[in-house]
Amino acid sequence: MKKFLSVAMLAVLPLTAMAQHEEDTENGVVSLAGREGFTIETKKGDFVFKPYLLVQTSANFNWYDDEGLDKAYNQDNIANSGFSIPYAVLGFTGKAFGKVAFNLSINAAASGGALLQQAWFDVQLKKQFAVRVGKFKTPFSHAYLTTLGETLLPQLPVSLASSVILPYSLNAVTPNIGTGFDLGVEIHGLVADKFGYEVGLFNGTGASVNTASKTMSDDWHIPSLLYAGRLTYMPKGVMPSTQGNPNRLNEDKILFGLSGSINVESENESTNDTRVGLEFALLKNKLYLAAEAYYMNVGFTKRQKINESYNFLGGYVQGGYFVAPRLQLAARYDIFNRNGTDDDGFLNMPAVGMNYFFRGCNLKLQVMYQYVARWGHDTQLDRDNDNLGLATHSATVMLQYTF
């Protein structure tokens, strides 16, 4: 019964849900306002076309604890280190007829279905109501919804991006709390310049799948999709989708957010995953602050014959401050109950970094160091298992160019 009540609550979210909205960064990569690169538009301004580019190149260092390493195969503590290209995005965005926005972008650094990073169009019937269709960011988490290239640190919080640990050997069941990009349809809008809403239906298969592969839920008898909604309250006007921008050092904005989703028959039809998140973000002149807390429940479908469900908690606090016009210092404290609330122990992950914005050329340098610590576990085995696959010490130096 509780499952059906949860679905019903999400179904009525369009009546009350409110969400973040910012016109200048609708494509999630660069501004339409013409600050980066160039824009082609008609004299009336009803047709706008803007090509854009974002390239990130990083040097990475990762050191892993001995647990999980097989010395017989000469596995080293230092691994997954060297140079990488997280994003090489080429795309175009724009507006047509004064009410239709569109975006298409390719991430050449990805593979498979993830090559198509975004592909959507958005019809704004009025400021309070618009419909978006295609591949875009799901309405969950301030960290994910921040404009790509304007994040405080080059790595997402581990509590959002890392898979949880389940006490079963099911290789196909590796959920993480963040939902990221997906294919679907969403209604959204802005009310009284303070409230907004996003409510959508998505495949729930993530950024790497561009095909229709879903069915009906055998247990709940509804389409096996991701049902998601997000609301925010911005008392001082729309919060910019940035975590640090040297051209926006006179802002005074604050955001409070609530989001939730149910992914029906996710993980290859093995689980029903429920997520809830709380958000806070603040921009006050040179200062940026943000905090998020999120919860995920993983319940198995009847065909798995596993009666237990598992709960996971995570969250982070982060802040940045411009100590000079183009130099931002950054810090984050991330915490993750990766092995579930039934077992004691958390990962706690402090990180520090800095961002330098080169004048007049759209270059950005980011530096970050993170330590993954473990606290409160009952046994040494639990402690060893909790950070499997995660680097104990990691450092990243990334150079980014956009136009």
Where do the protein language model's features map onto the residues?
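Outer membrane beta-barrel
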Residues: F38-K71, Q75-A207, P223-V238, Q318-A330, ...
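Outer membrane beta-barrel transmembrane domains
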Residues: Y316, G320, R326-R374
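Sequence/structural signature of outer-membrane beta-barrel proteins
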Residues: S58-E67, N107-S111, F140, F202-S208, ...
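Transmembrane beta-barrel architecture of outer membranes
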Residues: Y87, L116-Q118, D182-G184, S224-A228, ...
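N-terminal periplasmic/intermembrane-space "pro-region" immediately following the signal or transit peptide
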Residues: F4-Q56, A192, F403
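Detector for outer-membrane/organellar transmembrane beta-barrel domains
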Residues: R230-N339
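Outer-membrane beta-barrel "beta-signal"
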Residues: L226-V238, M354, F358, L363, ...
